[in-house]
Amino acid sequence: MGQFSSPLAGSLNSIGQNFLPSQTIETAQANRYQNTALGEVEYSFSRRSAFTLSGAYGILHFTTPGYISSHMVSTQAGYDYQLDAKNSVAVLASYARIDYTGTASPTEGYAAELAYGRKITGQLAFQVSAGPEETSASRPGTGGFRNLTLAANSALTYERRRSGLLVSYSRGLTGGSGVFIGAISNTFSGTLHHQFSRYWSGSVNGGYAFNSSLVPTGVAATTFTNWFVGANAGRRLGRHAQLAFNYGLQKQDNPAVCPVVVGCFATGFQQSFGATLNWHLRAVE
């Protein structure tokens, strides 16, 4: 959602990612499923300007009792103008509504952002957007409240023929990862990828997430912090299949009192290993 529609769009694509279901807070062992449907239309007024309208619907549903399931509807409109071959500006407006299963406590967010993107060289590009975000929420026992905060996104990308680097930051309203009824999330992340050969590829990634509960102004928020690193190696199998192996290491700092009765993610370092096999109807390029 919310991408620049100018020629920079290929590398400048992190604007507006907050209005999607996210899980930057780890839970204890629990079964869940998450799905997102996205759509986008664009109308070009000229070679240098365009209007983009996008929408999304996402669900985060826990089959393990005790966590907060949610579904989100969001939309974003943006006008993008290419100043020259290297610089673009955009005006973005976003809206999201999050409903939580079993409660009558929806959360809504309205954001307006100014965005700037620059193609520094043929391989290096940068983008940033920022603006006010108003969140409104209703909570049993406390009634409704409104907060005004900052929404922001930025990304730096570097791409070569066989390698690439992405460093990004985002801040804004999120669903709460099944632990909070709404949260303000700050996420820093970086990914480095490389194509070793026609068949083998790999990547490493890392980041930091800081999440705080959505509460009225003046009330102390509950917070989680999460550090994570990972690595992935993949191999193409023929023209239609890919096999990948991955490893993750993370550490989460929990609040003194866990917000959900079923318990929070274990403190200290946690490791994960996995393998995936993907098959595509179309031949893999």
Please name every model-derived segment.
Residues 41-43, 81, 118, 156-160, ...:
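Residue-level signature of outer-membrane beta-barrel architecture
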Residues 33-39, 73-77, 89, 93, ...:
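Hydrophobic, lipid-facing positions within transmembrane beta-strands of outer-membrane proteins
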Residues 233, 240-242, 246, 268-285:
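Outer-membrane beta-barrel "beta-signal"
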